[in-house]
Design a protein with these regions (language model features):
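Class I SAM-dependent methyltransferase "Motif I" SAM/SAH-binding loop
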Residues: 89-91
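A short acidic, Gly/Pro-enriched loop at the edge of an enzyme's catalytic core
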Residues: 142-151
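SAM-dependent methyltransferase
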Residues: 185-246, 258, 262-263
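A short SAM/SAH-binding and catalytic strip from SAM-dependent methyltransferases
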Residues: 150-165
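Class I SAM-dependent methyltransferase SAM/SAH-binding core
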Residues: 93-139
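A short glycine-rich, Lys/Arg-flanked "PGG" loop and its adjoining helix->strand segment in the class I
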Residues: 168-180
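Conserved class I S-adenosyl-L-methionine
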Residues: 2, 6, 13-80, 278
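Core SAM-dependent methyltransferase catalytic element
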Residues: 270-289
Length: 289
């Protein structure tokens, strides 16, 4: 759902209700949903972000590669859409549409009502209209246990959740919702690629030092201007951190696919220092039987 700058139960889903378009609002911290930073809240409420989203990401190299790896990693769907996949942080439905076309019963979850409206106006919008849930990824109690076969969380959406405890709570929810043996496909950006140039290396070091002094800051946290928002939040991972978080949340990590610095291909020579060379990772994890 986000790219940093360069250098109810699923069986009882209700149709997405239309709401009047409104400007983004600035909420005080005590009114923010759990795990949602102020800039992220504005992102989810801004009509302008949703309306231009598809065009904005169209030239991003990661677009296309992540969908291909997702469809290659998931087992083939059963006939008559009997294989249910949750797209967590579905945005305007980029992955939802691809999974629907591949024969999956695709359900989308997102906190942004404007983004969810965008799903209904795109390809397969009518089919997907009743398969959309507005929810905070950290608070997925609205979804019953063992009701999805697989799940995905692409485009560094998990990095938009503020706080490691909250990110792990999200992963724990997904492990509860996905049936035993099901897959989770998740993308994260790699914080350790920052060493490639001097400004990024300085930011990497500053983040490390700040994490030792400030309990509210975690190594890899970034706050930056993004499409008119002054303080967009994103947490970037290390290879070891995403592995540990998945395991601690009830997942078995089957593979961590390192991506090239621009995200446009799998990292060439992937076996050589992927933790430092990769621009990000796509993790393939399975819920134990």
């Amino acid at each position: 759902m986000n790219q940093p700058p360069p250098k109810a139960a699923p069986d009882s889903l209700q149709p997405l209700s239309a709401t009047s378009a409104g400007r983004s609002e600035r909420r005080p911290a005590w009114r923010l949903p759990t795990g949602v930073a102020p800039g992220t809240w504005e992102y989810t409420q801004a009509e302008s972000i949703a309306k231009g989203y598809r065009e904005f990401i169209a030239s991003t190299p990661l677009v296309g590669l992540d969908i291909r790896l997702l469809l290659e990693s998931l087992p083939a769907p059963k006939p008559q859409r009997q294989t249910r996949v949750l797209d967590l942080g579905c945005g305007d439905g980029r992955a939802l549409r691809a999974m629907w076309e591949a024969g999956f019963d695709a359900l989308g979850v997102d906190l942004s009502q404007p983004m969810l409206r965008g799903v209904t106006t795109g390809d397969h919008g009518e089919a997907l209209r009743n398969r959309l849930i507005r929810a905070n990824l950290v608070e997925l109690d609205c979804l019953r246990s063992d009701t999805a076969d697989h799940a995905c969380c692409l485009f560094s959406t998990i990095g938009m959740v503020r706080g490691r405890d909250c990110r792990r709570r999200f992963l724990q929810h997904v492990a509860r919702i996905v049936r035993p043996g099901g897959m989770l496909v998740v993308h994260v950006h790699n914080r350790n690629r920052w060493w490639r140039d001097r400004p990024s290396a300085r930011a990497w070091l500053n983040s490390l030092v700040r994490s030792l002094r400030d309990r509210e800051h975690e190594w890899g946290d970034r706050v930056y201007a993004y499409r008119g928002l002054a303080d967009m939040y994103l947490h970037t991972y290390s290879r070891n951190e995403i592995r540990k978080d998945l395991i601690a949340s009830g997942w078995q990590v089957e593979r961590l696919i390192p991506l090239a610095a621009d995200g446009g291909q799998v990292l060439p020579g992937a076996g050589w220092l992927p933790g430092w060379r990769a621009g990000g990772f796509i993790a393939l994890a399975r819920r134990p039987q």
